[in-house]
Amino acid sequence: MKVRNILFLVLASLLLCTAVSAAEYTDVSDTHWAYKQIDYLSAEITGYPDGSYKPEKSVSRAEFLTLFARIAFPDEWKRVEGEEWWKSAYEVCTAHDLLNNITGSRSEAMPRGEIAALLERFCSGWGGVHERADAAEQYVINWKEQRMEFPEWQPLFSDAAEYWSSVLISANQGLLTGYPDGSFKPGKGVTRAEAAAILARLKAQLVLREKKGCEYVCTVGEYWLMQYADSGSVGLALYEPLTGKLVQTVGLWKAAQGVSGYAAFDRLLSGSDGIYVWGRTGLYKRSGNTLEQIVAEPVLDFCWYDDNTLYYLSWDDTKQIPAYYCSAAYFPCASSVMKLENPGQNAVRTILAERDESSPMQNLTDIYVEYGTLYAAGSYCMGIGDLHAALYEVKDGKLTALFGEY
């Protein structure tokens, strides 16, 4: 056991040697999938005396936490000569209350579930938009019992129920990904290449947050869609992750009078589902590494009837946003049901119905097309845990209540 521990200390200490670029490693070619990430972390992570990087070697808890601390807390992490090489990282992470769920041996491989828990705590309060804000979160119409229901909870990955909150946050922040079979493998360790990829994404987001005031929203092809604030306005732009290079300015929204800057920033987008991105600056479709705008006005929810007909919920943010008890904490509520035919240069936009300002239930949140009929859901919160939802048929310029309204 002593020999094993000594070997662990020797190998791990190599992480803290003089930095070199990825091009100098004998076993990391410029075609390696993690080449750019390893090179990006040349100041934080190093190789071995024989000139190798060993990208497939497993990373221990102490190694991962040391690299994490150097990136997340560069002004606090400090290696003291004569002390164990991992001690400063553990002290810094403990001071920031990041190690509550990390209790295993320092020399053992750090599992992905623990990495997710670490990143969840560190990223708490960051203002990105969850990828899960999609159709899976809509109210479900229960026609038989004539009521609206919350959707059945679906985990982001098939095997991560124990870490669902940690995995959701770290994945939605673009830091961790799952496997093609839908699993996350929370008990699996990470290799040096995988650790470099995870921590390179973290470092790049920290740089964009600090230098440009950006918040990660989602990934579009090879780029990151970021939110940024600028002189009372909030915008969207695509950035190249590791270089921070601006690729495409997507949209700009100026906060209406009376809407706080934080609220405007937090709610710039309503959702992203892997194909579309939507919110205050409109509706966009992912197309390779770019976003193509379909609707220029605010979009809270949408559905396609066919290839040329789009229905969506919109609102006028120059008016007072419906302020039922719960909505201010989540998404704004739409006030108009819209139809867009022939999206593109010859698009025809029609207002199908508008919210009845006297009805507290008509805070529109979801839109549906079933068997050729258009419906919209509205909700109202009477208090904590007391949420009511109603279903309306959109017909003849009106919202006709079918059930749930009181």
Language-model features: where?
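Bacterial N-terminal signal peptides
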Residues: 9-18
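Residue position within the beta-strands of beta-propeller blades
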Residues: 226, 277, 312, 376-378
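Surface-exposed loop/turn elements that mediate protein-protein interactions on large endomembrane-trafficking
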Residues: 235-254, 282-296, 324-354, 388-406
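Bacterial N-terminal signal peptides that target proteins for export
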Residues: 1-7
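Short glycine/acidic-enriched loop and turn motifs that connect beta-strands
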Residues: 229-233, 282-284, 316-321, 330-331, ...
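N-terminal propeptides
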Residues: 18-215
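Repeated scaffold domains used in trafficking and secretory/extracellular systems
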Residues: 212-219, 257-270, 297-307, 360-370, ...
